[in-house]
Each structure stands twice: as C-alpha cells, then as structure tokens.
UniProtKB/Swiss-Prot annotation:
<dbReference type="InterPro" id="IPR037041">
    <property type="entry name" value="Trigger_fac_C_sf"/>
</dbReference>
<keyword id="KW-0131">Cell cycle</keyword>
<feature type="domain" description="PPIase FKBP-type">
    <location>
        <begin position="185"/>
        <end position="270"/>
    </location>
</feature>
<dbReference type="InterPro" id="IPR008880">
    <property type="entry name" value="Trigger_fac_C"/>
</dbReference>
<keyword id="KW-0143">Chaperone</keyword>
<comment type="function">
    <text>Involved in protein export. Acts as a chaperone by maintaining the newly synthesized protein in an open conformation. Functions as a peptidyl-prolyl cis-trans isomerase.</text>
</comment>
<dbReference type="GO" id="GO:0005737">
    <property type="term" value="C:cytoplasm"/>
</dbReference>
<protein>
    <recommendedName>
        <fullName>Trigger factor</fullName>
        <ecNumber>5.2.1.8</ecNumber>
    </recommendedName>
</protein>
<dbReference type="InterPro" id="IPR005215">
    <property type="entry name" value="Trig_fac"/>
</dbReference>
<dbReference type="GO" id="GO:0015031">
    <property type="term" value="P:protein transport"/>
</dbReference>
<dbReference type="Pfam" id="PF00254">
    <property type="entry name" value="FKBP_C"/>
</dbReference>
<dbReference type="Pfam" id="PF05698">
    <property type="entry name" value="Trigger_C"/>
</dbReference>
<keyword id="KW-0132">Cell division</keyword>
<dbReference type="InterPro" id="IPR046357">
    <property type="entry name" value="PPIase_dom_sf"/>
</dbReference>
<dbReference type="InterPro" id="IPR001179">
    <property type="entry name" value="PPIase_FKBP_dom"/>
</dbReference>
<dbReference type="GO" id="GO:0006457">
    <property type="term" value="P:protein folding"/>
</dbReference>
<keyword id="KW-0413">Isomerase</keyword>
Amino acid sequence: MSNNIPQNTVEVSSVYTYKELSIDKLKYEYEITVGSDYIKQKVNSRLQEIAENAKSPGFRAGKMPYDLVVANYKNEALEYVINNTIDYCSSDLMKKIEVKSHIYPKVDVISLPDLGKENEEGNFVYKLSFESMPEVPVIDLDKINLKKIEAKIEEEDIKEFIDSIKTKFPNFASVDDASYQAKDGDKLIIDFEGRIRNKLFQGGSSKNFAVNLGSGTFINGFEDQLTGMKKGETKNFKLKFPENYQAISLAGQEADFSVRVNEIQIAKDFENDDEIAKSIGFKDYSLLINHAKKMIGDQCTEMRNLLIKKELFDYLDANYSFDLPTDIVKQEQQRMEGELGAQNDSRKEAEKRVKLAMLFMKFSAEHKISLTQNDVLSVIVNQYVSKDVQFDRVLKHFESNKQFQELVRGQALEYKVTDYIIEKVSKEEQIVSVKELKELFDNI
C-alpha cells in the first residue's frame, strides 16, 4: 500500500484508511483513501481474468496478447475494481463505526490513480456520505387517551337527508299550458340536430332527449337558447365548441343546431311520503327512513374514524421526538408537492408523516404486526382503483414499481397499526349531534 496517506486518519485495514469529515445528527461524511498499489494489483488481476476469455479479430478466445488486453480493457477493469472497492470499503467502515442501518449512501470520487505512471500520488480517494436510521421509541399505549365521538341521529337529520334527496330527484310533471315558457330548473324533452359545415357530427343528434335547464349538460350557451321556449316550438342557433373540448374533432368548431321542444316538465311537490320513496326505488316511506338512517350512520362512522385517527396522529407527533433522516423527509415533501401542488407547510407535514411512519414500523415490529395480501389489496382497491383506473392496471403497476410497492405497503401498515392502537388504548366516549360532528370534521 502507498505510504502517501493523508494525516489525521485512522488505519483500519491493509486496504484503506478513513478520515472523519463531519457528523451531524444522523448525517455522516468520511473520506476514504485506498493506496494506488492495491488498485493496481486488483486491476492487473481483473485484466488477467478478462484475458482468459478475451476475443479479438485474428485471435482465438483467450489468446489475445496481454498488451492488447490492457489497451482495450484497462478502463473497464479499473471501473470494475473501483466499484468493488467502494462497496467493500464503505460496508466495512460502517461495520467498524457500528452504523447498523443507513439510508441513501452517496459517493463522490475525489481522485483516481493514474495507472500509466509509477508515482506515489495516485491514491484512490472518495467521500462517503450517508444518513443512519434513528433510534425510534416504542409507542406507549398506556399513556394514550382518545375521544370516541358518537353522533346521535335525530328526526331533523333524517328530514334534512330526505330533503336533499328531493332536491336531487325532483318530482316532475308535464305542463299542458302551450304558452308556458321554459325556465331554469325545468326538464325539457327535446329533439336536436347539430351540424358542422352542413354535416351531422357524431353524437350531435338525438330524439326525446331529457335536459334539465341549468344543469350544464350541454356546451356553454346551449341551455340558454332553450330558456323561454314553449312546447312544440322549434329553434335554430349557432354555437362554438370550446377550444379545450374533449372531442378534438369538435374543439373550436362552430356548429348549427336545430332544436324542437316536445315536452316541458316542471318540479312539483310530492303528494305523499310513499311517493317520495317510490320515486327513488323504495317500496314505501319506512324503507326510505331506514335507508336514510343507515346512510347518515355510515357518514358519521367515517367522520368519527377520521377524527380519532387525527387525534392519535397529533398526539404521537407532539409527544414523540427523534431525529429524522433529511433525505427521506425531502423525498416525502417532493411526493406531496407533486400530488397536491405546492404547500406552504409541506415540509412540516412531510416531517410528521415520516415520523409517524417510523413510529408505526417500530411498533409493528415490537408487537409482531405483519401485513397480509388482503391488507395490501384493500389499499389498492380503496385508494387507487376508480371508474377511470382499472384494478388490473394498478396491480400491474404495483408489481413492476418498487417505489409504488413501498408506498402502498406503508399505507397498509399505517392503517393496520392505527386500527390496532385505537382498539387497545383508553377512550372517552363523547356524544354529539350530527351537525356538531360535521363541524368537527370540517375543521380538520
């Protein structure tokens, strides 16, 4: 090994020496030096291995002159040796300084030996930077007391729910008055045709089509043209499709429309409760009441669960403190900003998420909580599958993308550990009204 070793270093082995550059909480930086003699020896050994099978025009495999092997493969051999040397020295150093686990090691090459010269200045020197994993405390269940909020469903809550159904599914009746002019909120049964340069375009015509004025079903301006029309009336008008219209062939195009109003229906009050129920598919009003109670109950359960989870998360964030790996926090912050857009407090929220994830990982290990296939599939189905994104597509992405796998597994572990903790800790029941529960939820 070369005698030209930097001062203030610690001799570790016959292969390398190291010098501590900085230690800041979880961050470590070291300068590692490997003598040129060692590198040359390893490069020569690698070249001899290559020579055994090297091929070149005019020479059989393994018969290439050694000087040609050196000329053709020296850089490849050096790269191979440098990579192996970095792996060995970095791993060995971490064992020596007793770093049990680390995150995202970074290597910066400072100097490489010049294999073409015989000198003592050609040591291989690189800087190793990494973060160690922090010592994470175990969550103490005995110290946690949460509020278990229960909402009492009253008659007024059921009435409000059914009133919302009336608004969504109004009771329409035909207008016989030939002089009646259609207005917002009315339902019109129409025939229409749309033409561009005198040609019908795809999807531009229909018979007995129902349109609610004010609903925005058609392109901007279409329903405005129908306002004021009478039953049996026909109207011709021009409209321009928006430049960003989803059908590219129609975007920005001017169209000629012809519309005939076949029928006008206006909303009217239901005659009795059973009529309300039947209008949306229930046999009688009592079944609608039961449906309303269930729907309100389900909504309250969802809000209650989110509230108690937030209370738990806030408690853990406030009562457990330890150093966080800055690289992981930075990655989480970038992921959040990519999904949600720039946030003023994204750094703080990223730190909270990383802290909770580490607390949950530690807790799951201590309490032997492991994920099942169903846990992972549940997250995929509930979080990522939608009418626009099919299950098979998400599953394929999960199987092929390691980063997405880690994200989904992390979410699944969070849900499982959170449910476990909430079940085990002390809880104080609090009865509130449905309105009060909604206010608490809206203030999250």
